């Protein structure tokens, strides 16, 4: 089963010694019926798919995950942030780690406000890109599908990952970094939104919301 085909929690990709799991795996070598370990459990993906690659050379990593951590979204920035640092330590270098910020999912809402863990996961990914060495992020909120948590059309997401890598890693003139809002002011009956770089917007301007400093 390939790494792309699973949606385990991020902690499954962390490195950690788990004696209970190790004992069960050792027994399973001689008794196939004893193999009851959940393949996506804590540290299983690391030991099964990542640890064997330590020592090999590569340019960087692409990370598309987060849906399964929505139930513990507030802790995600620490879980994924620590995992990235652990991977860097394992290879002895701070290689590029490009995160796919979760795209949209489910039907459009009458107001541009989304509750639940997904928005927090997206904010955590942005925080990690700002604070963890080597971490970067591609924005995909305008992509995704209403009824499929795994969008079938992966090409646009791949193109954006490539653009981030070309701009941030290979230092080309590609544009991979999405613009960010730096200020929003109410002037009369209109909102004036300022971005950190020139943008070309298309649309009716109705699909956005403003959060106050108190979180409301």
Description of each model-found segment:
Residues 1-216:
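Cell-envelope and extracellular/periplasmic
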